[in-house]
């Protein structure tokens, strides 16, 4: 996911995307805790995506 793609979305779409990413992060953390997570890079990838969405939301709120 790129920041340019996120800037084209509305605030409602970004909030939905953020909720989905937070759910994904929670599920990945639970899988890691139980030893079921085989692809550990997904955790950091989702964390970065959450940061991107929050950054774009803050930029749009400042306009």
From Swiss-Prot:
Show the InterPro entries listed in the entry.
Answer: Ribosomal_protein_uL29, Ribosomal_uL29, Ribosomal_uL29_CS, Ribosomal_uL29_sf
- What are the UniProt keywords, alphabetically? Ribonucleoprotein, Ribosomal protein
User: What lineage does the source organism belong to?
Assistant: Bacteria, Pseudomonadati, Pseudomonadota, Gammaproteobacteria, Pseudomonadales
Q: Which cellular components does GO assign to this protein?
A: cytosolic large ribosomal subunit
Gene Ontology BP terms: translation
PANTHER family from the xrefs? 60S RIBOSOMAL PROTEIN L35/50S RIBOSOMAL PROTEIN L29 (PTHR10916), LARGE RIBOSOMAL SUBUNIT PROTEIN UL29C (PTHR10916:SF0)
In Swiss-Prot or TrEMBL terms, this protein is called: Large ribosomal subunit protein uL29
One Pfam family here: Ribosomal_L29
Q: Which GO terms describe its molecular function?
A: structural constituent of ribosome
User: According to its UniProt record, which protein family does this protein belong to?
Assistant: Belongs to the universal ribosomal protein uL29 family.
What is the organism field in this record?
Stutzerimonas stutzeri (strain A1501)
């Amino acid at each position: 996911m790129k920041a340019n793609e996120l800037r084209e979305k509305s605030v409602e779409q970004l909030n939905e995307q953020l909720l989905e990413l937070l759910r994904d992060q929670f599920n990945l953390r639970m899988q890691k805790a139980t030893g079921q997570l085989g692809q550990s890079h997904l955790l950091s990838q989702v964390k970065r995506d959450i940061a991107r969405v929050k950054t774009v939301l803050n930029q749009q709120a400042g306009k």
